[in-house]
Design a protein with these regions (language model features):
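Alpha-helix termini
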Residues: 22-26, 51-59, 155-157, 194-197
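Eukaryotic short linear interaction motifs
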Residues: 2-4, 40-43, 74-78, 139-141, ...
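Extended, charge-rich low-complexity interaction segments
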Residues: 22-40, 191-200
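Short glycine-enriched nucleophile-adjacent loop
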Residues: 40-54, 66
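Serine-hydrolase catalytic core
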Residues: 93-193, 199
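Active-site catalytic motif of lipid deacylating hydrolases and related acyltransferases
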Residues: 1-31
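Hydrolase active-site cap/lid region
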Residues: 59-110
Length: 200
């Protein structure tokens, strides 16, 4: 949760990832992003650094594909974190209200960063193909939000987008609950990108 509510920490993590990707041993390798849950929010920090810092700009051109499993960005944080934390409706409501209050109080600083990164994520500057995984009963990653993002990338950004929406599986547990379908979708995605598929 600290990474979600502290943009500076998220930026540090994003910087570490990008430094690895531009290292001598990795700088010529193709990249496939595979983000889970708040990895969608962390990916927005990666996108921001690639756009704003020249030293990371080469990574953008090397991203061949993007896999997002149950992505949660800024707008889903109060809903997602509170639902992940407790089954108790009162505790969920208190936590959701507390997070919303935190974001309102620190709007001048934290929320401004969140909104800018959310906008960047939804208007993804990386136009390589994307694959979404989500489920209809995920208590953290809202199905309508995931679907709207996939549709926007496909219809407004003209990206190649595939998706696998499961009837039922818990947050970021789609691989375990629907192992065969998940694995086949990833393999097909990588084959379509012309990237060798390793044995999973």
């Amino acid at each position: 949760m600290l990474q979600i509510l502290r943009p500076k920490k998220a930026e540090q993590v994003a910087t570490e990832v990008l430094n690895k990707l531009i290292s001598d041993e990795n700088k010529h390798r193709p990249v496939v992003i595979h983000g889970f849950s708040v990895g969608g929010y962390l990916y927005s920090h990666v996108l921001n650094l690639m756009v704003k810092q020249d030293r990371f700009s080469s990574v953008k051109e090397r991203i061949r594909g993007q896999v997002l499993d149950s992505p949660v960005d800024f707008h889903g944080i109060p809903y997602g974190v509170s639902n992940a934390a407790s089954e108790n409706p009162l505790v969920r409501w208190l936590m959701k209200s507390s997070i919303e209050a935190y974001l309102a109080i620190f709007a001048r600083y934290t929320t401004k960063v969140y909104l800018a990164h959310s906008h960047l994520f939804h208007n993804n500057p990386v136009r390589s193909p994307a694959l979404f995984f989500f489920s209809k009963d995920d208590k953290v990653a809202d199905v309508d939000t995931c679907q709207a993002c996939a549709d926007y990338w496909k219809n407004e950004l003209n990206m190649t987008v595939s998706q696998q929406c499961f009837e039922s599986s818990p947050h970021v547990s789609h691989f375990y609950v629907h192992n065969k379908e998940y694995t086949e979708a990833v393999k097909k995605f990588l084959r379509d990108l012309n990237i060798p598929v390793v044995t999973l």
